[in-house]
Design a protein with these regions (language model features):
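C-terminal motif of bacterial Sec signal peptides marking the signal peptidase cleavage site
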Residues: 17-19
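Substrate-binding cleft/loops of secretory-pathway carbohydrate-active enzymes
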Residues: 202-320
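Extracellular beta-strand ligand-recognition surfaces/modules
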Residues: 526-563
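Aromatic-lined substrate-binding rim segments of carbohydrate-active enzymes
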Residues: 84-161, 178, 187, 191, ...
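Glycan-recognition and processing domains
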Residues: 400-483, 560-567
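Substrate-binding cleft of secreted/luminal carbohydrate-active enzymes
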Residues: 134, 279-426
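Boundary/entry segment of secreted carbohydrate-active catalytic domains
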Residues: 31-95
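Extracellular carbohydrate recognition and processing domains
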Residues: 164, 511-539
């Protein structure tokens, strides 16, 4: 029988009255302000088109206009704040055993704790540190949970997990009820949920690293102790319990599970992450480092694969309203058991994937995340997180074909012409195939099994094919971005492989741009191209990168052009 979560409705009412509890508790410690100004624009000077309408630089160009500032409700977070890296949100980590070692006892705010090989100061000591914070309550581990829980609920632990830890079954109604009592005492009764310094909380506090995977669920099923019906019955109310408990602060809850988990229930568990989000929580993934794998079809983020292989994000739904946390973690490139020979490539692609999913928060560790090595790129990421089509300074498309190996063996629920190949990563700018402008796969920049085998093969860049009559690339600008660009200056940044003869220009309804002449350097270069006035606006959203031949006119005499990345930028 379900153990009822006590006093949930009453708590919601109390939260609405300001977070007071039935019994007075000592005020929470208030740390000093962190000495860091987050309202900082680009740290690198913007590369404009210059007086001739075209400026070309070597390599990638991540620069943004000086006016750009971070989006509200967005940022970088980590275990420790780093003012130099503009990481201003630190963690407060606790174990369940630490804060409630005795059944029915008040929250112990002085006791220390440990989990995952980490040692934690007491709650009050951590609250007394400067700056905003995010939180994890490590709850499920047999060594994280209070000893009395397993005895009171008469449950066994499962495991070990891949980190050697055994876990209690939090889906057990008795265990879950006790955990909800602790969440209520910790976050509602103390007023911690309403603390403006608290940015968000990872929930539910299970399993390895408090990340909700299905390794332990599968172990319980294989042991004969759990079936689909029982699990889904618990799951159906679990997230409502948390949302109701947090009340008006429920937007701070972040579910740590994933779409299409590697679970034991087949199709029955495919969409459970979306169910948690639909209950009124944010969501987080921890594996955008594997930028090609398992996150193309992501219902919790409202990202879906189209029949032509492009990815579309439905931003009309609450998860992308700006009120919720949509987070990822990008720090495992030459860490966490991963390895790459090209860390810049790995960092770049993982961040493009995160932004394609419209993330507003990103966990980083400055060293392993290579922030010092690639400062301009990370600055662009910081200023892109949480932006919308209306507020973003740029819209972009990364031209590529990459296989999502998860769907190499799974049956996809809809039409997908070239399964498992995904075309491009796009954010308010879509590359469109049409007669005379069909983009072709190229092998000039191919990566295989970057970080690990699951990441598959990726062909970076797409090519024209003069022999097939395809002499350009058509771009469709999101109508919201275009409308917000009305009356503003715009440039197009095109990262291209500087090989072959000929030039290219940008064709718009307002006229053509100046030409970019290839020099045959054999390197990736980025051209910043001034667009004619009115090229992008409420009634103008189509652009075409067009080849020019040796004579400057006849495209058929040009060599093929490979393009890897395109950005439309509002300069005003």
């Amino acid at each position: 029988m379900r153990r009822e979560v006590s006093a949930v409705v009453a708590v919601a009412a109390l939260l609405a009255l300001g977070g007071c509890a039935m019994n007075p508790v000592a005020p929470l410690p208030t740390g000093a302000e962190l000495d860091v100004d987050l309202d900082v624009g680009p740290r690198a000077s913007f590369v404009d088109a210059g007086p001739d309408g075209v400026r070309v630089v070597d390599g990638d160009d991540w620069t943004l206009p000086d006016r750009v500032r971070p989006a509200e409700h967005s940022g970088l977070f980590s275990e420790e704040a780093s003012a130099d890296d503009l990481v201003a949100v630190r963690s407060i980590d606790l174990s369940w055993r630490q804060v409630q070692p005795e059944k029915g006892a008040p929250i112990d705010r002085a006791a220390t704790g440990e989990a995952q090989g980490m040692s934690f100061d007491g709650l009050d000591a951590q609250l007394g540190e400067p700056g905003a914070f995010w939180m994890r309550l490590f709850a499920s581990g047999a060594d994280w949970a209070p000893e009395w829980v397993a005895e009171d609920c008469a449950v066994d632990s499962y495991g070990p997990d891949y980190d050697g830890q055994r876990h209690l079954p939090i889906w057990d109604e008795c265990v879950w009820g006790h955990l909800m009592d602790t969440y209520r005492a910790l976050f509602a009764d103390t007023g911690l949920a309403a603390d403006p310094r608290l940015r968000f909380v990872y929930v539910p506090g299970a399993f390895t690293w408090a990340e909700y995977d299905y390794e332990m669920v599968t172990a319980a099923v294989e042991a004969g102790d759990l079936d689909e019906e029982s699990y889904l019955a618990w799951y159906a109310h679990a997230w409502d319990d948390l949302v109701e408990l947090f009340g008006e602060n429920a937007h701070k809850l972040v579910f740590t599970g994933e779409d299409y988990p590697f679970g034991p229930f087949g199709a029955a568990d495919d969409l459970l992450a979306r169910q948690a989000v639909d209950a009124g929580m944010g969501v987080r993934t921890g594996i955008t480092e594997l930028a090609n794998f398992h996150l193309s079809e992501a219902p919790a983020y409202r990202s879906s694969i189209q029949p032509d292989g492009h990815l579309v994000v439905d931003e009309s739904l609450p998860i992308h309203s700006g009120d919720f946390v949509v987070a990822t973690e990008n720090e495992c490139y030459t860490d966490c058991g991963y390895q790459t020979d090209d860390p810049y490539y790995s960092v770049r692609q993982s961040n493009l994937k995160a932004l394609q999913l419209r993330m507003n928060w990103m966990y980083v560790v400055p060293g392993p995340s290579y922030m010092a090595e690639y400062p301009e790129h990370w600055d662009w990421v910081r200023l892109s997180l949480g932006q919308t089509a209306e507020t973003s300074a740029d819209a972009w498309a990364a031209f590529r074909d990459a296989e999502d190996r998860y769907w190499g063996e799974e049956e996809f629920p809809r039409a997908w012409d070239d399964q498992p190949w995904v075309r491009n990563l796009e954010r308010w700018l879509v590359q469109v195939d049409e007669p005379g402008s069909v983009a072709h796969r190229t092998e000039v920049d191919t990566h295989v099994a970057d970080l690990e085998e699951d990441n598959g093969t990726a062909h970076e860049g797409l090519s024209t094919s003069v022999a097939d009559g395809d002499t350009g690339f058509v771009l469709d600008v999101d109508e919201r971005f275009a409308a917000a660009s009305d009356g503003q200056g715009t440039v197009l940044k095109v990262t291209f492989l500087d090989t072959g003869n000929g030039a290219f220009r940008v064709e718009t309804d307002a006229g053509d741009s100046a030409s970019v002449v290839r020099t045959g350097s054999g390197e990736w270069r980025t051209a910043t191209i001034a667009l004619p006035e009115g090229a992008v606006g409420a009634d103008a959203s189509r652009l075409r990168i067009a080849l020019e031949g040796i004579d400057g006119v006849e495209a058929a005499t040009a060599d093929d052009l490979v393009v890897r990345f395109v950005r439309v930028i509002r300069t005003d």
